[in-house]
Design a protein with these regions (language model features):
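C-terminal target-recognition/interaction regions appended to catalytic cores
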Residues: 103-236
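Class I S-adenosyl-L-methionine
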Residues: 1-143
Length: 236
């Protein structure tokens, strides 16, 4: 191919993966490709989410110098409020919203609802009173990490990284900024910049995984447009 894209978490550059990755890229380079490698943060490309990913682009050496350039970061960061505040509350009974697919509230225990009620937007488990902390979290997050679990998203900042388990309030800062619920599957998809009418197939866990594992649409578009520019130069 004239070009290829590889995307992964920054951990691919860690101790366990770095040698394997760079050995593979060296072989690709030897076979006739320029290799471009950079960490991009989705929030810089129209995604209301903090999401750092390694994006590697291969460009076949049909010319003397490489033509590809990474997209330039945008100045404006889209906040959670800008992205999802317009959505109505999902039904109390856990059913889908009648006009918005996958917009429903998860069932939460009384204790998890109490945890949400104790938090302000942007706060995680470090702000919970002792009686609402899970036993495994009674040690400071400075020691064991995971400070954002059992958290509410901020309104006026980007969201944390949407993971494959963002549908669970216990797995991260996935509580709605002001309503006492975790964000819906549709809200997660919007924070990944999928169109509101995008159709996902599967059960709740499968759809959450599809959304959380996806490359955010707006970031993919930004990189894709740069590849198109590169190919246009190539053909001219």
């Amino acid at each position: 191919p004239k070009m290829f894209i590889l995307e992964n978490v920054p951990g691919i550059e860690g101790k366990r993966g770095k040698n394997i990755l760079h050995s593979a890229l060296a072989k690709v380079e030897e076979s006739g490709y320029f290799i471009h490698e950079k960490i991009l943060d989705a929030q810089d490309y129209g995604v209301p989410q903090r999401r750092r990913r390694v994006v590697i682009v291969g460009e076949r050496k049909d010319h003397k110098f490489p033509l590809f350039e990474y997209p330039k970061p945008q100045e404006h960061k889209i906040t959670v409020r800008e992205a999802i505040a317009y959505l109505p509350e999902p039904p109390e009974d856990g059913s889908d919203h009648p006009h918005i697919s996958l917009h429903r509230r998860d069932r939460l225990s009384a204790k998890n609802i109490a945890r949400l009620q104790a938090l302000k937007p942007g706060q995680g488990r470090d702000f919970l009173p002792p009686e609402l902390l899970a036993d495994c979290h009674k040690v400071s997050s400075k020691i064991i990490g995971h400070r954002n679990v059992y958290g509410r998203m901020p309104w006026d900042d980007v969201a944390p990284t949407i993971t494959a388990r963002f549908d669970s309030f216990t797995r991260g800062m996935f509580g709605h900024p002001e309503q006492n619920r975790s964000i819906s599957l549709r809200e997660g998809a919007i924070l990944q910049t999928f169109p509101e009418d995008f159709v996902f197939v599967g059960n709740k866990v499968e759809v959450a995984r599809q959304i959380g594992n996806a490359v955010p649409v707006a970031m993919a578009m930004a990189v894709g447009l740069q590849i198109k520019k590169c190919l246009d130069k190539w053909n001219n």
